[in-house]
Amino acid sequence: MDLPGPIHDFLVVLLGSGLILGSMGVLLFNNSIYSAFSLGLVLVSISLFYILANAQFVAAAQLLIYVGAINVLIIFAVMFMKGSEYSKDFNLWTVGNGVTFLVCTSIFVSLMTTIVDTSWYGIIWTTRSNQILEQDLISNSQQIGIYLSTYFFLPFELISIILLAALIGAIAVARQ
């Protein structure tokens, strides 16, 4: 979106805070339904970030696929499960949680130091004239299709396998 600087910055901060609050809700809520709704907030915030970045097709795909299908599937799977058997013997902090926290913190710190230490001067930033020229030559959907079938073929196939495994797992849980 072509917004003035202060409005754009305000929206980025607002969406970022929604993203952080939603992800904290996913981690901290004891009720699985509330965690699933917080995940929906995170996915909607990511979709709105795509809209701010002028990627409306990716935003629509994010909303339809992740919020509309995957998150609803997670909510149905959580509703089919018995919640009482998972709330028994709930320890607030275990050794596995500590190890997971340390691993996630170290990955976060290494990513932040890598981002800060990387010189971003070699990256070519697109200008408005380049975007208009590219839109005249090829449509946005065709460009995404070309990238998915050439440069991002392996990650695209891996994501499809992961989604298939999640769907099979949800069906197996629902059958029990």
UniProtKB/Swiss-Prot annotation:
Pfam family, one: Oxidored_q3
Transmembrane intervals: 10-30, 33-53, 61-81, 92-112, 152-172
EC numbers, comma separated: 7.1.1.-
InterPro entries (alphabetical): NAD(P)H-Q_Oxidoreduct_6, NADH_UbQ/plastoQ_OxRdtase_su6, Nuo/plastoQ_OxRdtase_6_NuoJ
Membrane-related topology note: Multi-pass membrane protein
Compartments where located: Plastid, Chloroplast thylakoid membrane
Disulphide bridges: none
Family from the record: Belongs to the complex I subunit 6 family.
Reported function: NDH shuttles electrons from NAD(P)H:plastoquinone, via FMN and iron-sulfur (Fe-S) centers, to quinones in the photosynthetic chain and possibly in a chloroplast respiratory chain. The immediate electron acceptor for the enzyme in this species is believed to be plastoquinone. Couples the redox reaction to proton translocation, and thus conserves the redox energy in a proton gradient.
Subunit annotation: NDH is composed of at least 16 different subunits, 5 of which are encoded in the nucleus.
Protein name (record): NAD(P)H-quinone oxidoreductase subunit 6, chloroplastic
